[in-house]
């Protein structure tokens, strides 16, 4: 997918190097999560931060060349135990796949380290490949569970990259929802909404997208793929990742179509009342007023920033770390 283009760019330097080193494959361990957190009074799914997981890969001299760490959420939903089990299993698989994919970069990380030393660098000044995964539940009720994942990768170069992807579940069954599950007319409505914002912004001094777009453009259609959208308290959100429709400096952009605008198109079991239709970016939040004029306001929310502090409570599970040398 084009959303992975950022990570591919960050890895170009490492992949172009010829030398390589060796390190052992780490073993994986996990700390059982604390499942004592009670669901909400309304019987909705409840979440709490689960176990931390960290894996370190080291070169022969003991220097860390790759760090892979994650913090995951655990779901508590006894009212629908089968759905809870299905969702929890999928969440754990997402984390497992993350560490597996991260560790595939072991050879490139060693290569990057060896080249760093050859160029005169000191091992104590080396910055290892770093991969980090965390997530944040954004909607959890008796119909829908939507979780947004933040995946950071540093593979050498001037800066790392951040991608976000989502998981949407049917709260009754635990099934991973696709865009088709929302209703036949939903995809065209949300893409038309995104196109409207993009083209309007391009007519302003901000104009941070590459160019104007059409709804049937491949880049626009890619936002309909599973993982690139989620249901929030405000509506259905399309994720426009770094480098997809705008350069790295513009960060990640999100296009929300409100539940009110989706009324009659979004299947009833997934809808809520109200919501806000907007475009949120590092540049600000864009909306259309009653006259159809594009307006911009400042926003404290940046889709390209990983949650931290009050947004990410401290893990209740223990820290599970592994290393290899």
Each model region followed by its residue ranges:
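Compositionally biased intrinsically disordered regions enriched in Thr/Gly
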Residues: 21-325
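C-terminal motif of bacterial Sec signal peptides marking the signal peptidase cleavage site
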Residues: 15-19
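Sec-dependent signal peptide recognition
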Residues: 2-10
